[in-house]
Amino acid sequence: LDNTAVFSPPISTLFANLRRQIDELDTSTTKVVVFGGGTGLSNIIGGDSRRRDWARNPFTGLKQVFPQLASVVCVTDDGGSTGELQKDLPLIALGDLRHVLVASVRRDHLRRSYDLDRIGARRCAAVLHALFNYRFISRPESAEQMVRESGAIVADLPAELRRVVDDLTQRLFSDPRLIPTLERPQCLGNLLVAAAIYKQIDPALGASELLASHQVVRTATIRGLAELAGALGVQPNTVLPCTTTLSQLQMLYSNGVMVTSEDKSSKARRGYPVDRVVVDFSRTPFL
């Protein structure tokens, strides 16, 4: 086959025409909801916020086209930092939510909320990018050290947003329920999301009580995400989990073997095709 046919000019022309048609539309009242996982959603909504060069052009993607854009994010990815976090906290997988949350930061929201100019908004997004993507292996000695080693220039944050970041990072070292998470390799962004959720929960409730109090965790998750989103320059309640019920992905292979865990299935080399994919919920799911 002629490889040049794969990326033929007509295809790029079609995309260019589509973009031109969308640009000509009034999308101010168009409500758009996008479903998916962290990487895919992040890319189309505002660019892959895990990329090192994302901060150079953070205000791009569908969020610039549709003001009333919302994302519903899958929460079964239990690999990496998220998997480590779930060893200590009875929360849904937060990694993809964090990924999409950063990608959803809007210039107009930052400017309106904090009276920033265009350069100030871009610098603010760059700080959030550094903070939410920073990963550590050994336990940080303090919140200040953790923020400093992230490389984030926190002086570029508006005072009000800086107070939000300070509050959440300090909670990681003061809330007895969150302190154990610092002993494992973590992504700071996931910890900040967890701290925002636990901020909504009665300090007297530990892991065992929260496992039995799914309504409490559900409410705290939605409220915590909304409050954090608003502070980050994201419209509240526009980055939502597909469920707040603890769940795991299960892959059934054609040879009858079932693998539980999205992370494990991604590393499995069974030599057989996947016959079925199901989600195993810890209880009747709230969707």
Regions found by a protein language model. Give the residues of each.
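Non-transmembrane, aqueous-exposed alpha-helical and coiled segments at domain scale
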Residues: 1-34, 39, 48-67, 71, ...
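Short N-terminal binding/cap micro-motifs at the start of the first secondary-structure element
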Residues: 40-45, 79-82
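Short, flexible/disordered intra-domain loops and linkers
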Residues: 46-53, 206, 210
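Electropositive, gly/pro-rich neighborhoods at or near active sites that engage anionic ligands
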Residues: 61-65, 74-286
